[in-house]
Structure formats: C-alpha cells, structure tokens
C-alpha cells in the first residue's frame, strides 16, 4: 500500500471516530443545550433573512399602498381617484382589480402607479357549486397576488364585495403588520338580502358575519355618507375616531362645457350618429342621461314609464312639449330585457339609445346633456350614487329617486329634483323643462356643485385619519 492510500485510510478513520464522539456527546447532552445551540445559530438567520423575505420582501423607501377592488378598474372611478391622490402625495401605488375595460390613460402613464390585473372573473352562474368555485378561484388569485405585494405600508379595499377579499386581507394584515383601510360604499349583506328576499337566509347571515367580524380588524374606515358612519358606530360598534366621511366627488375629467361650445360638441364623431334628425337644442329639445348597472336596486322602468306618460301628455294636452333624447349608459344582467322593451314601444317624442362608453368618452357625453337621472335607491339606504357626483361635476342638475340618505347630496329644487314614482318623475321633467326660473336655479346650483372636487374631500379625510398629512 502506497503512502497516499495509507494517509486517506487514516483520515477516514479519524473522521468516523470524530463523528462517533460528537454523536455520543449529543446523545448525552441535555435537550435544552441542543435547542440553545440551534437558536443561537438559527435566530440571526430568521431575523435577518427569513422574516424580512416572508413579510417585507418588497419593502420600498417611499410609502407604498395596495388598492384593491373586486371589480373592473376601468369602471371603478372612486378606486382610480384614490390611486391618483396617493400617487400625487408621493406614494407608490399598486392598483389591483379586473381589467375588463382599459383604466384611465393617466393612470397607465403614471410611473408611481403599477396596475396588477386579477385573472378575469367569469359569471359564476346560479348554482351554489358554481358560486363556490368562483370564490375559491378568487381566493387563490388574491393570496398569490398579496404574496407578491408583501411589504406595502397600507392596503385599501373597496367594500362590497366582501367575500372573499375582506377576510383574506384582514388575515394578511395581521401577518405582515400592514395597515388596512376599508372604504365602505355599501354593505354586501344588504345587496345579497335584496336578491334572496330576507335577512335570515344562511348566505345573508354569513355575509353579515364576515363584514361585522372582519371589519373590526381594519385600522381605518372611510364612508360615503355621515349616515353610514353612524350605522358603523351604532350597529357594528366600530370606534368613531377611526372612521372618516369621504363624500364622493367628481374627478378632474368631469367639467362643465364652456359656454358656446355645445353645438360643436354635438357634432363630434363619438355622438353625432345618435342625434335624431330635426333634434334642436336651441329650440328647447332636451338631452337626458342616466347611468345604470341594470340591477334590482335600480328600476329603470320608472324612467321609461315617465317618458311614456310624457309622450301621452304631449299627444293629448301639450303639443309644444319639446323632444327628449335619452342616453342610457352602463351594462348589467337586465340590460337585454330593457332594450327589448324599448324596441317594442312606438316612441314619438322620445328617442332612447343604450351606450357603453370608454372612461374618456363618458365625461364628454355628460357635458352635452341638460339633466341627469339617477334611479339608485341603495340596498342599505345609506350610500349615495356616484353617477350624481359625475353629473354635478359636469354642471348637470339631477333628478334622483328619493331615499333616506340622498338628502346629503341632492337638495330638492336647489341642485336637483327628487321623485318616488314614474308620475312624479314625469312631473319633474315637465317642471324643469317648462319653468325657466326653475331650470335656471337648478343649473346655477349644479354649476356651484361642480366646484367641489375629489382631492379636497380625499385630503380632508386622510388628514383626519392621519394617513396622509396635508402640506
């Protein structure tokens, strides 16, 4: 055997002997000593690498917020306004939601705003199994996306919908010490209650429990009305100091049309083809607009019924009543049904068009109209229709369906008119069209409303909650 072989054999023997000695020592050592050694070696690793990787992997020097909506970003104006305002305040913004329509161009071009699309949400169908499958898929997508977003200082979510987003984000908030802002537009359980017809339905009770329990884990709350804040304090037992009222206000894209430009605007390609022959706004013909989601809490038949009464009045009692052009914007589950009803009616004085507009064209349409109509009634009675704010931003007086909280936004015969039935809406139309003084007062006050802007409302609420301080 040569010298090198002897040396290798000796080294192996020494190694095995050392291993046996260490094994014997560990076998006789007390367990606390072993765990002390493990902690001594492992704790620095956990603190300096593993924990930051798990919870703060994407931490940035500037403040960072993830803004979530389980809806289409292109048609979620309040969420987009939040993104603009946080970006303007110097924050990094992660804007998360579905991309059915393109979001506003300024957000796409903003270097501080990163848009993160959730995989498309197909219709769940009516069966419980299909709904459960959709919730499971949404949960997987949200969890995966939140993993990528760990390190955010804040998460802001829109409610409703609350399932599955609210429980997931509430748990994530605890694990990562992210602060959670809950932006209340309405209550998910009241929306579901409208569909099933009663509060004591298992699904409604589950939805109520989710909102009641997990809302307590939020650090801050924003509501769209003072009535909603009172409800959260009295019924959900949330502390008033953590709740700020942030009224919806129109974005900067909603502006009144400068005087003298209406004729040229009506000739623009996006709208020109919808103007009927002989329709003359100079002669008093009137353009109305309504935006709807074609759901049960907005009975658009009230508007169509009012126009039918208007047609009858024009034929039987007052042939001088002007023509009406109505634009119906939006989409939803009952749209096809209403379109068929309109097609099957013989209209004489009224023309109705159903539109689905881009985020850029919708403000341009509002500028061309004389009055806006809102049929929103609110499943809770506590929220306000965003569409009316857009109308006010464009200088349009609004005819609104009356319900408890609407008085926080629309003062009857000041900046709009309120109604409860189709007959009352028809009377509002004739009153506003025929009475020059009323029309003038409504227009002047709507123009005053157009000066109330989103950023002032946002800055005031964020300062009250001490999230963003006013400079």
Swiss-Prot record:
The residue spans the entry assigns to the Lumenal side of the membrane are as follows 1-31
Q: Which family does it belong to?
A: Belongs to the glycosyltransferase group 1 family.
In the UniProt record, what gene is named as encoding this protein? ALG1
Topology in the lipid bilayer is annotated as: Single-pass membrane protein
Mind telling me what this protein is named?
A: Chitobiosyldiphosphodolichol beta-mannosyltransferase
Taxonomically, which superkingdom?
Answer: Eukaryota
Entry GO terms, CC: cytoplasmic side of endoplasmic reticulum membrane; endoplasmic reticulum
**Which keywords annotate this record?**
Endoplasmic reticulum, Glycosyltransferase, Membrane, Signal-anchor, Transferase, Transmembrane, Transmembrane helix
Q: Which reaction does it catalyse?
A: an N,N'-diacetylchitobiosyl-diphospho-di-trans,poly-cis-dolichol + GDP-alpha-D-mannose = a beta-D-Man-(1->4)-beta-D-GlcNAc-(1->4)-alpha-D-GlcNAc-diphospho-di-trans,poly-cis-dolichol + GDP + H(+)
Q: Which residues cross the membrane?
A: 32-52
């Amino acid at each position: 055997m040569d010298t090198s072989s002897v040396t290798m054999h000796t080294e192996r023997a020494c190694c095995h002997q050392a291993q046996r000695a260490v094994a014997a020592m560990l076998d006789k050592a007390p367990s606390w000593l072993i765990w002390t050694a493990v902690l001594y070696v492992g704790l620095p690793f956990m603190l300096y690498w593993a924990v930051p990787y798990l919870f703060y992997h994407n931490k940035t020097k500037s403040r960072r917020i993830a803004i979530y909506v389980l809806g289409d970003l292109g048609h979620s104006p309040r969420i987009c306004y939040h993104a603009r305002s946080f970006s303007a305040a110097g924050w990094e913004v992660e804007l998360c939601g579905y991309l059915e329509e393109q979001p506003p161009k300024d957000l796409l071009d903003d270097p501080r705003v990163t848009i993160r699309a959730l995989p498309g949400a197909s219709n769940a169908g009516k069966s419980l199994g299909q709904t459960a499958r959709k919730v499971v898929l949404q949960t997987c997508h949200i969890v995966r996306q939140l993993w990528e977003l760990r390190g955010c200082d804040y998460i802001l979510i829109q409610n409703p919908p609350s399932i599955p987003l609210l429980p997931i984000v509430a748990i994530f908030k605890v694990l990562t010490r992210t602060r959670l802002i809950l932006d209340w537009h309405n209550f998910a359980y009241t929306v579901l209650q409208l569909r099933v017809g009663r509060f004591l339905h298992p699904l409604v009770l589950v939805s109520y429990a989710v909102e009641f329990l997990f809302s307590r884990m939020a650090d801050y709350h924003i509501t769209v009305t003072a009535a909603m804040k009172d409800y959260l304090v009295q019924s959900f037992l949330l502390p008033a100091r953590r709740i700020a009222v942030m009224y919806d206000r129109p974005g900067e894209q909603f502006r009144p049309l400068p005087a003298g430009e209406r004729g040229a605007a009506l000739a623009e390609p996006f709208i020109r083809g919808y103007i009927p022959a002989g329709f003359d706004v100079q002669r008093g013909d009137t353009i109305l607009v309504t935006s709807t989601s074609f759901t049960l809490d907005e009975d658009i038949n009230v508007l169509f019924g009012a126009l039918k009464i208007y047609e009858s009045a024009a034929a039987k009692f007052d042939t001088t009543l002007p023509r009406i052009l109505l634009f119906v914007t939006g989409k939803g589950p009952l749209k096809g049904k209403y379109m068929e009803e309109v097609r099957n009616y013989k209209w004489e004085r009224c023309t109705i068009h159903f539109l689905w507009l881009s985020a850029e064209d919708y403000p341009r349409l509002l500028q061309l109209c004389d009055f806006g109509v809102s049929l929103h009634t609110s499943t809770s009675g506590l929220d306000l229709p965003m569409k009316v704010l857009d109308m006010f931003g464009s200088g349009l007086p609004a005819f609104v369906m009356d319900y408890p909280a609407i008085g926080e936004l629309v003062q009857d015969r000041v900046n709009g008119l309120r109604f409860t039935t189709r007959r009352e809406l028809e009377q509002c139309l004739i009153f506003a069209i025929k009475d020059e003084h009323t029309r003038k007062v409504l227009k002047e006050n709507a123009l005053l409303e157009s000066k109330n802007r989103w950023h002032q409302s946002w800055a005031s609420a964020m300062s009250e909650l001490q999230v963003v301080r006013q400079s």
